[in-house]
Amino acid sequence: MLADGEVGTAKKDDDAGGFFFTADDHEALIHRPKPLADEAVPSGNGIAAFALQRLGFLLCETRYLDAAERTLRACWRALDEYPHGHVSLLTALEEYLEHPEVIIIRGDKDELARWQSAADKLYAPRRLVFGISRTEQGLPGALADRKPASA
């Protein structure tokens, strides 16, 4: 979905925001559904908005944050009318309104384990901690710019 650098182009609704259930190259349908409500599984749009936000925060990529915001805006009426049926969208909205704290740790394997353990000890539900090896190559986005300190 993101390999070409685009945000879900085959399922994205460029006009209204959000994502359709089927790709644009799918057989012709009378109605192209865009699921918003959670059922036995969470809504694809709720999960997409949540994942795009997390990816945007991690990589410092506004295109992912913008796509998440457009999805939330497209779903606003459904959220307003029946919030209990849209928990995955509410979760994404909550994180949109109160951004997470992102901690990226680069270092050797032993250092990573120690720092991650220390960061995880404090209860912080809005904290995302990522440990990336000092030797990791080919990182995307802003992660490539964050070089580990010299040993």
Which functions belong to the PLM regions below?
Residues 1-151:
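Glycan-recognition and catalytic cores of secretory/periplasmic carbohydrate-active enzymes
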